Amino acid sequence: MKAIIFFCFLSVMVFIVAEASSLEALKIFEGERDCVGENGRCRDWYNDCCDGFYCSCRQPPYCICRNNNG
């Protein structure tokens, strides 16, 4: 009985650690890609171009950030 309880406890701990590490990795990835500058690749649905730029998808799947003024 103690072995079953220990196994359940261990499984829960492994799940918590795995979930926490995947969330941390996601935060790191999002932090690396704060915004994309002019002529950088972007994703239209993600709105990842810097201020003053918009994501243009004239030739999908290669969308690029273009200047709002021209």
Curated annotation (Swiss-Prot):
Localisation: Secreted
Tissues where the protein occurs: Expressed by the venom gland.
Keywords: Amidation, Disulfide bond, Ion channel impairing toxin, Knottin, Neurotoxin, Secreted, Signal, Toxin, Voltage-gated sodium channel impairing toxin
A Gene Ontology cellular-component term: extracellular region
Propeptide: 21-33
PROSITE patterns: MU_AGATOXIN
GO-annotated molecular function: ion channel inhibitor activity; sodium channel regulator activity; toxin activity
Disulfide bond sites: 35-50, 42-55, 49-65, 57-63
Remaining remarks: Negative results: does not affect mammalian sodium channels (Nav).
Family: Belongs to the neurotoxin 07 (Beta/delta-agtx) family. 04 (aga-5) subfamily.
Role description: Insecticidal neurotoxin that modulates the insect Nav channel (DmNaV1/tipE (para/tipE)) in a unique manner, with both the activation and inactivation processes being affected. The voltage dependence of activation is shifted toward more hyperpolarized potentials (analogous to site 4 toxins) and a non-inactivating persistent sodium current is induced (site 3-like action). Interestingly, both effects take place in a voltage-dependent manner, producing a bell-shaped curve between -80 and 0 mV.
Name used for this protein in its record: Mu-agatoxin-Ao1a
